[in-house]
Each structure stands twice: as structure tokens, then as C-alpha cells.
């Protein structure tokens, strides 16, 4: 199954956007799926429904960190590689969607706007964000 399809199915099964993207790749990098789902849970809906950076984007940043992230204090090269990949991911995501900001992608304030309308916008918009994030990860990392 294609990674984008897998991630979108994960989202439709009840997990948030960040969980869907991050957990799709976690086991490839030695992190079990349960831990990945727990770690990324608070990042959904733009950081806990705050509408900040899109959770699919945050999930992708975590995947980039698993592949390239610095784990030695003096390894500046890995840190710079990670930052460069995050910047390139963001550029490509913005080219597709205009922004990486959740509330702008959805066109709603997740904490203030009508809950029924917000839920409909999430169903309409977020699967595409999950798919786009996953496709960009595939382009950049594999």
C-alpha cells in the first residue's frame, strides 16, 4: 500500500493528522507505532486545536528528525541537514497549499467557530494535507 494511502486511512480511522503522518513512517526508523501515536497526539489540529502549524506538517517534521536528526551534542552537520530538510519540506507544502498554518488551511478557528462546521472542514481539508505531507516526504526522503 502506498504511504499516502496508508496515512490517509490512518486519519480516517480516528487518528489526527500528525499521528497519521508520523506513525506511517515510525517503524521504518525503529520507533514502534504505539509510541509514535502517543508522541504525536498533541500536535494535531495545529498543536492541540490551537490552529498553529498543521499537524500533518508537524508529523512530517518528526519523520525528518527520525531520519536525519542530531543525536550527538557536537554533530552540527546532522542538525543543519535536518533544518534544511524541514525548510525544503515547508517550501514544497506551501507551494501546494499556500501555507503551513492549520487555521488558514481550514479557514476556521478551531477553538471558536461552530463545531459542526469545523468538523466538516476537517473532513474536507485534512485528508489532502495528510496526503500532501506524505507525498512530499516520499519525494524528499526516499
Across the structure, where does each feature detected by a protein language model lie?
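Mg2+-dependent prenyl diphosphate-binding active-site environment of isoprenoid biosynthetic enzymes
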Residues: 20, 57-67, 83, 91
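C-terminal binding/interaction regions
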Residues: 82-142
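Phosphate-handling active-site elements
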Residues: 28-38, 66-85
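Acidic-glycine-rich active-site phosphate/pyrophosphate-binding loop
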Residues: 24-42, 104-109
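Electropositive phosphate-/nucleotide-binding environments in soluble metabolic enzymes
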Residues: 1, 15, 19, 33, ...
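Glycine/serine-rich anion-binding loops at beta->alpha junctions
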Residues: 43-62
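Short glycine/serine- and small hydrophobic-enriched flexible loop segments
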Residues: 23-27, 62-69, 135-139
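Active-site-proximal helix-loop elements at catalytic-domain edges
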Residues: 1-29
